[in-house]
Amino acid sequence: MIKIAVLGYGTVGSGVVEVIQTNGEVINKRIGEELEIKYVLDLREFPGTPVEHLITHDFEQILNDEEVKIVVEVMGGIEPAYTFVKKSLLAGKSVATSNKALVAKHGAELLAIAKENSINFLYEASVGGGIPIIRPLTSSLTGDEIEEITGILNGTTNYMLSKMYNEGADYDAVLKEAQARGYAERDPSADVEGHDACRKIAILSSIISGKLVDFEDIYTEGITNIAANDIKYAKAMGMKIKLLASCKREGDKLDAIVAPCLVEPSHPLYSIEDVFNAIFVRGNMLGDSMFYGSGAGKLPTASAVVGDIVEAAKNLDRSMMSTWDSEKLELEEKAETKKKFFVRMQGDAETLAEQVVNIFGPVELVQVEELDGEFGFVTAVMSEGTYEECAAQFPQIIHMIRVEA
């Protein structure tokens, strides 16, 4: 019998218990041994629940129990999760976590400790919820040079942008609806300002590069400045606006960014709607591949965590995960990265077109009949630095959105 402890009995923690209890027979068959939850760590009591007699308030009880072979961290946040996870690994216990903040900040260190102790630190659920992406990158696709990962990694913002596109609603209205449905927190900044997606792409970037990609080094822009009029231009061009998190190889560097982008119908991420997530992966041998599914939610995320528990249980005395170095990878300078840009500008297109072309070079003009006193245009491919230099000469610019190739 393999005994585990679950740290945290919130949404994901209760989901982990539910998955194990519901699918216990098939889980045990896949492990080849019975799995038992011995402890659930939480500050609260849960009378009348399946974990009523498993609750402990003392982490040291778990740490000092040699019967506990796997610790499941689903508390969230950095502390005390980091301390508990590190102590568990140093004590020879494998860890499965869904904590993206923990993995993004301390993943390199925790993976190294696990490797030194011939145990595992597993984190499939930290990116994409129930979408399997970590294990494919660390096992199935290890024969490939991964050239690009671009994803819709936050369900809240994808839901909001989908509503704005399909219903013509403005940002504030769809945010309130997302909060009412439980998709967005009372303080939605982690989602709408792009921080959640940033941590996730930092983890994926670290995996494919083998070095630490610091989330604080990734240029991050959320959707708070996306207005209903931006959506009207997108529709006029036959495109959609998506919050994309991407990392692309540029020589020996990575170009990593989180930002709203205009996406053409031919792009695999164009059709991803509502709260769903999707991750586009391009390998030099694989070609293009897509991973799609529920990127959050109690049971999809818990399912991914339990998948890691099963892997840890099957490999109790063997470290099976690849790691990344603690040495930071230098990212491509934002000013050097190249793409097309969509620009909204106050004024009359006929009056300003010549000046725009003289500064920006060839552009494709875009006009929306119902929007008076402004127009839009799409530039040719240019560097971010060049765009900024050109844009500085036009105080009439209302907004800019990058165009995903």
Features from the language model and the residues they span:
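A conserved regulatory-domain signal marking ACT and ACT-like small-molecule sensing domains
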Residues: 309-405
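Low-complexity, glycine/alanine/valine/leucine- and proline-rich hydrophobic stretches
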Residues: 260-284, 298, 359-371, 381
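Rossmann-like NAD(P)H-binding beta-loop-alpha module
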Residues: 68, 115-196, 203
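N-terminal glycine-/serine-/threonine-rich beta1-alpha1-beta2 phosphate-ribose binding loop
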Residues: 1-90
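Substrate-binding/catalytic subdomain of NAD(P)-dependent oxidoreductase enzymes
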Residues: 175-271, 276-278
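General beta-strand structural signal in soluble alpha/beta enzymes
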Residues: 55-56, 96-98, 121-125, 148-151, ...
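Rossmann-fold NAD(P)-binding glycine/threonine-rich loop
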Residues: 81-87, 91, 98-137
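ATP-dependent carboxylate/acyl-activation modules
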Residues: 268-323, 330-338
